[in-house]
């Protein structure tokens, strides 16, 4: 990845994303930690999201040795990442479809748990913003696999190094992150 891209992301992570508090934060996993990473400060900001997508497309994804037709994960953390990667590939002349996986099926309309053009998709690169225990990503993987989509690799902005990547590996999903928690303190 371009060091200027990673360096810019790292500075933004330190400035906007990482927080420390003596009073623990409750994480999505249910765990508590004095260290919190709100990656929405990257994924919901146009410039930062654009740089993030370029990092994934230019450096991280080529090293994965994977062909995929779609990119997505559990809403909300994965959504902007999937959209940005999809748009980045489209600008390069390749269609990679973004998929949104709901935590549960809709209670109205078609009742779908996956949104996007997924019915002809065979392979998906799963994405998330932060991996702690891997629970959210595993949920997305299981939903995608239930409809016949093959998922073997995933990417995230930050691995909290709390067993999530290992939990995903037990389900035959190899995660690759841009950053690790230990880089910040």
Swiss-Prot record:
Pfam families: Pribosyltran. 5-phospho-alpha-D-ribose 1-diphosphate binds at residues 102-103, 106, 108, 128-136. Orotate binds at residues 132, 160. Pathway: Pyrimidine metabolism; UMP biosynthesis via de novo pathway; UMP from orotate: step 1/2. It comes from the Bacteria. Keywords: Glycosyltransferase, Magnesium, Pyrimidine biosynthesis, Transferase. It catalyses: orotidine 5'-phosphate + diphosphate = orotate + 5-phospho-alpha-D-ribose 1-diphosphate. This is Orotate phosphoribosyltransferase. The lineage of its organism: Bacteria, Pseudomonadati, Spirochaetota, Spirochaetia, Leptospirales.
